[in-house]
């Protein structure tokens, strides 16, 4: 049904409708991946390029540059589709591509972990429609698909990064500050 999110500030209120759709029939019976699966993890940009026409697009900032170590190299969904026989032939039962969602950072985001739009496949990989085709063909090969979506961080280009509710909503340092801890 439709529910309303109610936002208020002092005496002012506004409501936003939010629909919760019914589950698709049989979705509760859907099987997930388990310890019995052999999962093939792949980084789409580095895996296989079957459509050079989408390596660089007019609506994304970083251009393909195979000579750049941290640059985009052009792998795409069509390359993944074209190699499903190979993946299944290895004995894999599931395929896990790193994030395929739009990641339009100016550089170094070929890995997909700086999402800018959680609803759209990055056009350098293909389209939402091609993603659905990939999933269907993977299922035809007996492969489950794990969609990698990281919701606890996003790219600097995501709209909510440009409209933070408070300046200290996220950690902001005057210069680059390494925050990862490495153990050897």
Whereabouts are the PLM-identified features?
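Alpha-helix initiation/capping motif
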Residues: 1, 33-34, 158, 165
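Extended acidic/polar, glycine-enriched regions
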Residues: 1-32
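A broad, low-specificity signal marking well-ordered, structured residues that form hydrophobic/aromatic
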Residues: 16, 40, 95
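Compositionally biased low-complexity segments at domain edges in trafficked proteins
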Residues: 29-55
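Substrate-binding/active-site clefts of carbohydrate-active enzymes
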Residues: 47-184
């Amino acid at each position: 049904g439709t529910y309303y999110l109610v936002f208020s500030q002092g005496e002012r209120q506004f409501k936003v409708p939010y629909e919760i759709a019914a589950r698709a029939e049989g979705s509760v019976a859907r099987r997930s991946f388990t310890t019995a699966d052999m999962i093939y993890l792949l980084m789409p940009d580095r895996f296989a390029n079957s459509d050079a026409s989408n390596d660089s697009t007019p609506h994304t900032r970083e251009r393909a540059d195979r000579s750049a170590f941290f640059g985009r190299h052009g792998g795409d969904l069509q390359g993944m589709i074209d190699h499903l026989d190979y993946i299944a032939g290895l004995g894999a039962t599931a395929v896990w591509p790193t994030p395929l969602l739009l990641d339009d950072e100016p550089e170094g985001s070929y890995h997909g972990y700086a999402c800018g739009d959680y609803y759209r496949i990055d056009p350098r990989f293909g389209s939402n429609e091609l993603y659905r085709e990939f999933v269907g063909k993977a299922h035809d090969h007996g492969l489950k698909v794990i969609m990698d979506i990281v919701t606890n961080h996003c790219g600097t280009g995501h709209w909510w990064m440009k409209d933070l509710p408070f300046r200290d909503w996220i950690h902001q340092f005057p210069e680059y500050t390494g925050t990862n801890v490495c153990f050897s």
